């Protein structure tokens, strides 16, 4: 194993009461590498990703990004993000508010949040006037692009 892989997991264990969902997982992902996690339902794929983005805490082991531990860093400060299978958008909010949400958590100024949201609308080929459109009024494909824009908003180092 290289000394400073992009992402390294050392001895990751995740337990839920008496149930061990992940048992001593070691993994190394290099810069620029694409990595796929496959397995049957209930095998721990989602649990692993939830640990990587900080939605759950590891029971044991460590997660390192470029050699620095991130498993004790709060989720809103980690340089990782995920697009949920269900998209997990806020239907009562506008497209712009959804995209800006992770930036608001990071205390980015309103002007900078708006500028980044508009930049991402352009990148993902959604009309700029969608900024004020309710997510509930978007098509399924448009919602997927909004979820991707939200995940890219703070320019994460790793996207799941």
Name each model feature, range by range.
Residues 134-138, 142:
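Conserved ABC ATPase signature
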Residues 155:
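Conserved catalytic motifs of ABC-family nucleotide-binding domains
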Residues 148:
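Hydrophobic anchor residue at the start of the ABC signature
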Residues 53:
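Helix-to-loop junction immediately C-terminal to a conserved catalytic motif
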Residues 38-40:
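The feature captures the beta-strand-to-loop junction immediately N-terminal to the Walker
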Residues 69, 111-129:
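Conserved ABC ATPase "signature" region
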Residues 96-104, 114, 118:
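Short helical segment in ABC ATPase nucleotide-binding domains corresponding to the A-loop/adjacent helical element
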């Amino acid at each position: 194993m290289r000394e400073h892989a992009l992402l390294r997991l050392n001895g990751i264990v995740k337990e839920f009461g008496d149930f061990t969902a992940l048992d001593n997982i070691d993994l190394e992902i290099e810069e620029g590498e694409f990595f796929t996690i496959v397995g049957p339902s209930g095998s721990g794929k989602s649990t692993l990703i939830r640990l990587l983005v900080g939605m759950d805490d590891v029971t044991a082991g460590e997660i390192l990004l470029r050699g620095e531990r991130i498993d004790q860093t709060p989720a809103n400060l980690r340089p990782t993000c995920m697009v949920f299978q269900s998209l997990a958008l806020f239907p009562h909010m506008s497209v712009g508010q959804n995209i800006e949400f992770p930036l608001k958590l990071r205390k980015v100024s309103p002007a900078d949040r708006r500028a980044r949201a508009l930049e991402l609308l352009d990148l993902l080929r959604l009309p700029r006037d969608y900024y004020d459109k309710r997510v509930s009024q978007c098509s399924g494909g448009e919602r997927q692009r909004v979820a991707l824009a939200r995940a890219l908003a703070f320019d994460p180092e790793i996207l799941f």
